[in-house]
């Protein structure tokens, strides 16, 4: 059983929902990323982590995460360097489940089998590839399955029912349930029909459902916990990193862990 499945099994046993921060790898550098991941584990501030691989043209990310990626790219961060960092962290005792958010072009460039083999070897537990349609993901899905890695797929409010059914029949690990139409970013409230939409995905899914996009406050996390199996927070965390980008890695890591504990407080009450 991989770490993703094991984490959700443990959470079910404990009667808890998952808190999953999105961390833009290499923002502002990989030393900070390493410090953040270690601190999240040491303080119990995350149940799983979504680790974003910097890309110059992310299709689903708003200005905050785009800026995070630009800072990482300016620092010379590459997919190879991200994977190597994870490998060193695993060797040092990091056990948090890590799901990689990565553009398909970065997976395709070295060859899909080679990329997945490397990711599995360093301890990546699943891939989220937002720009690869489910209809074209069969070869990747087979390779991920052979590597015991989760193939995490996204559904959105605009996903047609037939396509949603197809996605839910292929996903493993968890369903990434996009809360709003559009790109990532902090929002004041969920859109009309949000509860009905998430309940519908949850009812049809055979794996856990985690909601992301627009979650930036403890009350958002609390609302998601009533409907789904976990909450994913990204832009608020990238903002916190940007606000402290001139600080030492340990300071930035503390700031991120503080925010994660604040946001996830409703899941522990």
Which residue stretches match the model-derived regions?
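Active-site-adjacent beta->alpha loops and helix N-cap segments on the catalytic face
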Residues: 1-11, 30, 55-66, 74-89, ...
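Short beta-strand/loop segments at the ligand-binding rim of alpha/beta enzyme cores
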Residues: 14-20, 92-103, 144-154, 202-213
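Conserved, mostly hydrophobic/aromatic
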Residues: 21, 52, 119, 167, ...
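Glycine-rich beta-to-alpha transition loops that act as phosphate-gripper elements at the mouths
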Residues: 24, 101-109, 133-134, 155-159, ...
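Catalytic cores of alpha/beta
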Residues: 30-42, 159-169, 211, 215-231
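Glycine-rich phosphate-binding active-site loops on the catalytic face of alpha/beta enzymes
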Residues: 47-56, 124-128, 133-136, 175-185, ...
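Active-site/ligand-binding-proximal alpha/beta "capping" segment
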Residues: 174-181, 185-230
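Alpha/beta catalytic cores of nucleotide-metabolism and tRNA/nucleoside-modifying enzymes
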Residues: 199-205, 216-226, 230-269
